[in-house]
Amino acid sequence: MIWHVQNENFILDSTRIFMKAFHLLLFHGSFIFPECILIFGLILLLMIDSTSDQKDRPWFYFISSTSLVMSITALLFRWKEEPIISFSGNFQTNNFNEIFQFLILLCSTLCIPLSVEYIECTEMAITEFLLFVLTATLGGMFLCGANDLITIFVAPECFSLCSYLLSGYTKRDVRSNEATTKYLLMGGASSSILVHGFSWLYGSSGGEIELQEIVNGLINTQMYNSPGISIALISITVGIGFKLSPAPFHQWTPDVYEGSPTPVVAFLSVTSKVAASASATRIFDIPFYFSSNEWHLLLEILAILSMILGNLIAITQTSMKRMLAYSSIGQIGYVIIGIIVGDSNDGYASMITYMLFYISMNLGTFACIVSFGLRTGTDNIRDYAGLYTKDPFLALSLALCLLSLGGLPPLAGFFGKLYLFWCGWQAGLYFLVSMGLLTSVVSIYYYLKIIKLLMTGRNQEITPHVRNYRRSTLRSNNSIEWSMTVCVIASTIPGISMNPILAIAQDTLF
């Protein structure tokens, strides 16, 4: 009898929860319409994979790419609408969040064609790969619009779990397993520290979880200058630092870059930084409004360490992927300058602009690495010697992307850094900008060293990998070259016409 009553209560409670969720989705679903498109794409992928006897791979790519493009279209149609807070304060929709969601969707859209040939050559399971990519994209999009502590924790966990699975996708590779283990352990530790910081914020504000309500709660409780807020600030900085991977929270980055499948590295190298940057700007700017001097100092230290260590250690690397790992650590130091400058001096606009260029530069470089790796099976920098003699298009594409990453004019990377450093200088961050300029010069050195190998490799320096280089005849070859071409164009042409991009970025401010 007691069991029967308990069972009835459980059914009633479950029904209430389901009805409440259905009510929220019915009345607030339009506010997350781009996310709903991705969810529908995920369901469609699962249905086709479980019901079709003959796996028709082009359909999986088509469904994934179409859902991403449709989601981008839905975002563009919603541009410049009034800011809206939905789902009982859990989710906020405004231009600032949507531009970061657009960047994440753009990354995923470019990464899928980039990975087609790799998946065919390595015979990886295509459905699971696309499911993890779309789910990680969904988690990143929810993180960009998260407006309370619970959503800010759950959304990156959705992204992180898919990232762990993607990084260990080649199960037979010892390096991949080692990278996944390190990534998983450090990711779990950072999530624990992040939640610890959230608990201090929650307690100090009198039990508030929404970002703006936390500020009001801190004013009411007079706890905005308490030691608890300092503990929360340090803990949250460490937690977010793992996602952004600045020094000294970068230990996982080189191993994961080297051990994971290259298309996965391309995806993680940009999407994780875009989503974490969006979250960091909101967390530091709103709940820690009264501790701006403290978090400015913390981020300045992280930026300086990242720019110095990332670029200096990159010089000594012999693997292309490890070199790009340390390069990305240096690049995030430049992005942090925009976060510190904030809204007052176009800091966020400069950060968004540089992020857009960084996506094209980084993905273009990885597209070249994927293409070269599939033809030769090597990742060593010296094995690129003389590539121009065998594949001029690939060599020129890689050279342009590397030059843009280094910030040489008139490429997009130069104007992105120029705008970022100018905003930092206007805000009085003279030492930080000076370090950025010096480390940019250092980065140009190791990029030019690779370009010299590509273009001027002598006959005795050309390795058997390039000497026996053969272009692929697979039908999917066009897809990776398509991604490569788009990224190369985006790394060069925007440097000539910057005004429209800056105008769009400046419209995304709070």
UniProtKB/Swiss-Prot annotation:
The gene is ndhB. One of its GO terms (molecular function) is quinone binding. The chain crosses the membrane at residues 24-44, 59-79, 99-119, 124-144, 149-169, 183-203, 229-249, 295-315, 323-343, 354-374, 395-415, 418-438, 484-504. This is NAD(P)H-quinone oxidoreductase subunit 2, chloroplastic. Keywords: Chloroplast, Membrane, NAD, NADP, Plastid, Plastoquinone, Quinone, Thylakoid, Translocase, Transmembrane, Transmembrane helix, Transport. InterPro entries: NADH-Q_OxRdtase_suN/2, ND/Mrp_TM, Ndh2_N. It is an enzyme of class 7 (translocase). It is found in: Plastid, Chloroplast thylakoid membrane. The lineage of its organism: Eukaryota, Viridiplantae, Streptophyta, Embryophyta, Tracheophyta. NDH is composed of at least 16 different subunits, 5 of which are encoded in the nucleus.
